Amino acid sequence: MADLAQVTYCGLYCGLCSQRNRIPPRARALQEAMHKDGWELWGPGIPGFEAFWSFLGGLASSEPRCSCREGRCGPPFCGIRKCAQEKGIEVCAFCDDYPCERILGLAKGYVTLLADGQRMRAIGIDAWIQEQEERCKTGFAYVDIRCEPYEVPDK
């Protein structure tokens, strides 16, 4: 059985979020440059520096900090997550109502969402996760193609 920790209910893959694949190395680079310049020594004299330094350290961590399935990532009001949990659906692509209005609204911004859902249904979740891992290696992130505005339903 697949480890769904990196798969959102709506069918996005967490590893393709810039919070996971782009921000950490850039934050580490900034952290290293600031360390080299001695910011740790004289920065604390600047109001807000300690909070900033702590935040930067968190961004630099490559450990996943959130999970849609735990309710700690994405909008807290997400109606897609709520619906999937109520229906006992692991991923919306496997729901009889897919794609529903909620998914269609989100797909306005995440233009690969519907094709990814169809692919997931065709090859199964395990094979789909493997494909997403390969996609991660290309440097792709959803932010590269995300269109605004899009809808995250609250119901």
Predicted regions and their residues:
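Hydrophobic scaffolds flanking metal-cofactor catalytic centers in soluble metalloenzymes
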Residues: M1-V91, Y98-W128
